[in-house]
């Protein structure tokens, strides 16, 4: 299935996909969050008949439209890369992966594409009720798009509802609902959408604070701040619940990722959660005797509780996961990395032997090889791993990204609470420090979201599909120079699109809500 491939090709293919995904995620969360906020504002207008709320909704709707258009462009490129750069992946799991993507394209995207036209051009042309319904259906469509994409991503983290067909050398879906309703998929959807809501709330809050700093459109700004702060606080509180669920699912399904998130090399019972820490750069191998941290502050036993819902539960570290021998939460003894690698090689060899036996029409031998393949298939991907150290993701990047996400999440809760208190006291319009904090918090939501995706994707390495297909076995056999060329072309293109969006948005913001109403 995989030949000798230049490692530079793997690195450049990963870099290109990461570039596209991270640029795409600059636009998606604002679509998810701002879309709901504008729909809430239009709902207030529908219920009250207050024209000020209509102008407010129209202004944020204009910024939503600018962002939506750029997000669609980057998303299309991202989907095409599966076929161009990751053809082995596309072949091996295309039967499963393409199903949610197809539903996203046929149902969700066309739904939002249909109603967005009414939302933008239907003011005073259709009834208030129909226009409001179109606005809500547009954001529901966008959210459903996110749902199916996240189901596909969750399946890569936790592959279920499929079986391997040795005759086609492909994984084939046999239970659609197991894929769509897996606990990882459900939790990932809510966690990701809530993060988008927070980005939208911070965006509205920050732009509104800019108007207050400029002493412009004060009533518009104050009403927008109130809606965004309430919305953002609700999302920030709910995301704690989904974050806890994410940590639990990672502990159950991807223990190596959890160990990297915590810089945990030696596991144990009653393990503490690192609140703040500085990793020891001298620790370059899981085999050395260097301490993992130069400095750290831990919450006693909290990691054990997050991972197993038991303050004294055992949580394996990186060394334990590599060496095996510990008792898992299912009561079984964990295999070592070397044992898994041997089982993976056995599965790969059994597949080759099975296909040869089928070709030779040796039914008896084919049956034996198939049994061997099925017994060892859960470790199929390990057969492509050459060194157990390859199973360890980048600890530093995963560890620090996780803390950036969590610390910023706590900051957002504090910001929204303070904003609502100041709003209740009628102080926001005259509190310039809070206005500056609100304005400069806009990029922090994006940083938190990007950090979360780094934890999810870097922490999963070396796997494209957990335990089944490593990233190194997923790529297309291309000339590395061609991938480098398209990497830089995409970098230039995406940067131009980003600059264009920011420029158009800044121009619209400077014109103000009065211009958006015409």
Where would I find each of the regions flagged by the language model?
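Membrane-interface helix-loop-helix modules in multi-pass inner-membrane proteins
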Residues: 67-137, 154, 458-462
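Membrane-interfacial loop-to-helix junctions in multi-pass inner-membrane proteins
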Residues: 48-66, 92-98, 102, 122-140, ...
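Hydrophobic alpha-helical transmembrane segments
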Residues: 28-36, 107-115, 196-206, 404-420, ...
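C-terminal substrate/ligand-recognition segments
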Residues: 390-453, 484-508
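Hydrophobic alpha-helical membrane-insertion segments
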Residues: 65-74, 136-156, 232-243, 358, ...
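Aromatic-rich transmembrane-lumenal/periplasmic boundary elements in polytopic membrane proteins
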Residues: 152, 234-338, 342
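Membrane-interface interhelical loops and short amphipathic "cap" helices
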Residues: 1-22, 49-56, 80-102, 154-190, ...
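Internal alpha-helical transmembrane segments
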Residues: 117-125, 130-136, 147-156, 173-176, ...
């Amino acid at each position: 299935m995989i030949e000798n491939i230049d490692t530079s090709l793997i690195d450049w293919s990963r870099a290109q996909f990461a570039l596209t995904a991270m640029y795409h995620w600059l636009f998606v969360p604002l679509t998810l969050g701002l879309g709901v906020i504008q729909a809430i504002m239009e709902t207030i207008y529908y219920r009250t008949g207050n024209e000020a709320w209509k102008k407010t909704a129209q202004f944020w709707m204009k910024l939503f439209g600018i962002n939506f258009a750029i997000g669609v462009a980057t998303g299309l490129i991202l989907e095409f890369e599966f076929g161009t750069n990751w053809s082995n992946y596309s072949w091996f799991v295309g039967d499963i992966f393409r199903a949610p993507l197809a539903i996203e394209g046929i149902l969700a995207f066309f739904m939002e594409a249909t109603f967005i036209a009414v939302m933008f051009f239907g003011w005073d042309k259709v009834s208030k009720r129909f226009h409001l319904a179109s606005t809500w259906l547009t954001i529901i469509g966008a959210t459903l798009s996110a749902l199916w994409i996240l189901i596909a991503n969750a399946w890569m983290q936790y592959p279920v509802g499929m079986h391997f067909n040795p005759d086609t050398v492909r994984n084939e879906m046999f239970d659609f609902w197991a894929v769509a309703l897996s606990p990882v998929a459900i939790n990932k959807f809510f966690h990701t959408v809530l993060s988008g809501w927070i980005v939208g709330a911070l965006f509205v809050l920050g732009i509104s604070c800019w108007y207050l700093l400029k002493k412009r459109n004060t009533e518009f700004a104050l009403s927008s701040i109130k809606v965004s702060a309430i919305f953002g606080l609700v999302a920030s509180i709910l995301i704690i619940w989904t974050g806890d669920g994410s940590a639990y699912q990672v502990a159950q399904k991807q223990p190596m990722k959890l160990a990297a998130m915590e810089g945990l090399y030696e596991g144990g019972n009653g393990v503490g959660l690192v609140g703040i820490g500085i990793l020891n750069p001298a620790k370059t191998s899981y085999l050395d005797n260097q301490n993992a941290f130069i400095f750290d502050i831990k919450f006693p036993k909290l990691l054990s509780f997050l991972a197993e819902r038991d303050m004294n539960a055992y949580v394996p570290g990186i060394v334990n996961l590599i060496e095996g021998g510990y008792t898992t939460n299912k009561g079984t003894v964990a295999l070592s990395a070397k044992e898994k690698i041997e089982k993976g090689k056995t599965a790969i060899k059994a597949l080759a032997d099975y296909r040869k036996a089928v070709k030779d029409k040796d039914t008896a031998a084919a049956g034996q090889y198939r049994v061997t393949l099925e017994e060892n298939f859960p470790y199929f991907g390990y057969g492509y791993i050459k060194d157990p150290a390859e199973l360890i993701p980048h600890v530093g990047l995963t560890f620090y990204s996780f803390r950036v996400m969590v610390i910023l999440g706590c900051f957002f809760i504090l910001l929204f609470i303070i904003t609502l208190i100041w709003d209740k006291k009628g102080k926001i319009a005259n509190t310039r420090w809070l206005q500056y904090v609100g304005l400069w918090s806009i990029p922090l939501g994006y940083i938190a979201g990007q950090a979360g995706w780094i934890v999810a994707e870097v922490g999963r390495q070396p796997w494209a599909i957990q335990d089944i297909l490593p990233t190194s076995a997923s790529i297309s056999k291309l000339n590395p120079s061609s991938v480098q060329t398209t990497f830089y072309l995409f970098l230039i293109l995406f940067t131009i699109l980003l600059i264009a969006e920011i420029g158009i948005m800044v121009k619209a913001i400077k014109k103000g809500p009065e211009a958006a109403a015409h």
